[in-house]
């Protein structure tokens, strides 16, 4: 559940989803409601918001045919926000719901933010981040508390993106463990005790960036998806 309210209009949102969270949203269901008067461009605005929120969470890479995101406006407030006002409010709501979905993902013990910096394009940044988010070896390493930057590089290298495999920097929870694709700081100084794990990958081929949220791969995820008959 997420809410936005000022003295002119209000936006509220709800979402359901614990597994199969991946573009195109998989089995996730979300409804966002506002009392604002929506502009003719509401669909376009909401698509941009979804592309940068719901479509940038990726729990397990599995998709389905049953995803839905709805934006509903009653116009009851009588206030018509500007496009930028509306987009900002929707980003707040959908961003919060996206983070909550990943935090509540099946079997999750860690929320993982994978930030790509200095990519050739935003789409390349998304591709590299998503390749890491869907890499089971990397997700298992995070579950085990292993700051294995080699798995980060290996995952990044599978992406269909412009990169130089010899010049990539990697930070794990703020510790630069890899510079120009070679060891840097002692990886044992990386602390994975907190719920949030931050992976920063600097491709050094441009100035675009993007972040994907995912989670680790645990025993509980395997159990929850195997201990029943469909």
Predicted segment positions?
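A structural signal for small-residue-enriched, beta-sheet-centric alpha/beta enzyme cores
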Residues: 1-230
């Amino acid at each position: 559940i997420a809410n936005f309210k000022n003295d002119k209009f209000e936006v509220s949102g709800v979402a359901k989803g614990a597994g199969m969270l991946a573009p195109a949203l998989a089995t996730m269901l979300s409804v966002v409601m506002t009392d604002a008067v929506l502009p003719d461009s509401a669909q376009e605005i909401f698509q941009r918001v979804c592309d940068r929120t719901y479509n940038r969470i990726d729990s397990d890479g599995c998709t389905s045919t049953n995803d839905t995101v709805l934006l509903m406006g009653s116009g009851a407030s009588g206030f018509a926000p500007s496009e930028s006002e509306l987009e900002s409010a929707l980003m707040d709501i959908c961003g919060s719901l996206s983070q909550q979905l990943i935090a509540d993902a099946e079997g999750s013990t860690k929320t993982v933010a994978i930030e790509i910096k200095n990519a050739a394009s935003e789409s390349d940044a998304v591709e590299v981040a998503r390749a890491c988010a869907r890499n089971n070896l990397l997700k298992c390493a995070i579950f085990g508390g292993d700051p294995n930057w080699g798995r980060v590089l290996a995952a990044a290298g599978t992406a269909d993106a412009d990169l130089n495999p010899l010049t990539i920097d990697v930070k794990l929870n703020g510790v630069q463990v890899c510079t120009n694709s070679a060891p840097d700081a002692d990886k044992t100084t990386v602390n994975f005790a907190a719920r949030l794990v931050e992976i920063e990958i600097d491709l050094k081929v441009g100035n675009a960036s993007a972040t994907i949220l995912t989670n680790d791969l645990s025993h509980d995820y395997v159990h929850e998806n195997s201990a029943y008959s469909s």
